[in-house]
Amino acid sequence: MNEIVTKCPAKINLNLRILDKREDGYHNIQTDYQLIDIYDHLKFKSNKDRNITIESKETYLNDEFNTIYQSAEKLQKLMNENAGVVIEVKKNIPTGSGLGGASSNAASTLVALNKLWRLNLNKHDLIKIASSIGADVPFFVYGKNASGQGIGAVSYTHLTLPTKDS
């Protein structure tokens, strides 16, 4: 397997209860997350040069400070062999909109490279890595509508939402 293509969904917070402020600057919250049908598209192509290259029309993605690069770098450090990747990014989720585009991209990168590089990390391990990247990244690794508390990444329980028919 040399290539993986992913769709990175956006999310909305159905409700958001802001609680107390923590010593680390974050606020404790309670929220319900809903995945929505707006997607960024990422294509991962492995190579053996240990370079992480991001290709996008969005120039702000072409540096080492974005969540896609951070996610790839964290997994690359777990590799015993040369592993590089070219990541093509097509953005559809509006930047800075609160829809979780950067977090979704980070989570998709973790999941895709775990498979592409055959790291065999389980979901719990990926969520642990995700929490070091951003507060919403674990939700996207979890991949289902969920309730969150703490800074949003502390615990997730599956949230069942009513359908149009119920």
Model-derived features with residue positions:
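Glycine-rich, charged/polar anion/phosphate-binding loops
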Residues: 27-29, 150-156
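Conserved small/polar residues in nucleotide/adenosyl-binding loops
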Residues: 157-163
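Gly/Ser-rich oxyanion-binding loop with an adjacent helix/lid
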Residues: 81-152
